[in-house]
Amino acid sequence: MTEVAGKMAFVLEILGEIYYFRSMKKLLYVHGYNGSPDGGSCRLFKKHKPENWEVIGMDYCQDDCELALRQIRETIEREGIDVVVGCSLGGFLTLLTTGVRRFVVNPCYLPSVELPKLKPFEGFPAPSPELIATYAAQEWRLKQLPEVDRKNITALFGDSDELLGMKYRDMMADDLGILGGIVPSQHHISEEAVLLICQMLSDERMKDAHRHSFENEEEIKASETCGCFSCCRTFAPNEIEDWVDDADGKTALCPYCHTDAVIGDASGLPLDKTFLHAMNLRWF
């Protein structure tokens, strides 16, 4: 290999890594009362996360609700978080973290009611009245969540939650119009519930990717490489000859199989065989 070819190979490798990580998605896990960012629940998400997802566990100051919410917001902005998952008390905090896709599992919907019931456990003290007051002071915000933001929330409730039961499922439906799903789980999130969330995340990503396959003329022409998730070939944009007129623009047809399943790399998506085959399985 010549020196020039060697340098080119190195540059392409670096660009490939940049391309890969640009397509990464990040999930932030917010634990419950006296939980841990390295606990079993977070480890389950790391075990079952979809491809190209990174799971980040964070700790927060649980003694002060307002400070905890600020710490979560700072983490979202610093890490570029795409999805937040919160369980129990972390579910309450996650509900109030607006502007991002989020899942809540067995959320402690009313901390002012549930926290006083907790007793000292394994060296951890019971919640103090001062701590409880900081959460009670934020509960009014639940009913003030904007309608558009509520659509970003998916709630799941364990069918065997020994602490909260199912009462907050009905309350959230009445207050927020969010009817939570029922999953096989006790209060601590089960592996089945984690698997369900990860499957939903994978499916949502594929739906997002699918949007790049129609009315995509501008994006295709800005790309260097295109891929088709029907025949799973990759090719240059100038090979595309046929377009379909859609309502808001033109849609590219694959030059090999003539299917409207073409995505350009200007989308930021990884057009490797793994991705194209995964899309093929989802949509064909």
What are the language-model segments listed below?
Residues 25-79:
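Active-site catalytic motif of lipid deacylating hydrolases and related acyltransferases
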Residues 223-228, 251:
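Residues immediately within or flanking Cys/His clusters that coordinate Zn2+
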Residues 237-241, 263-264:
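Short, non-ligating residues that shape and space the ligands of small metal-coordination modules
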Residues 241-251, 269-270:
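Short linker/helix segments within small regulatory modules
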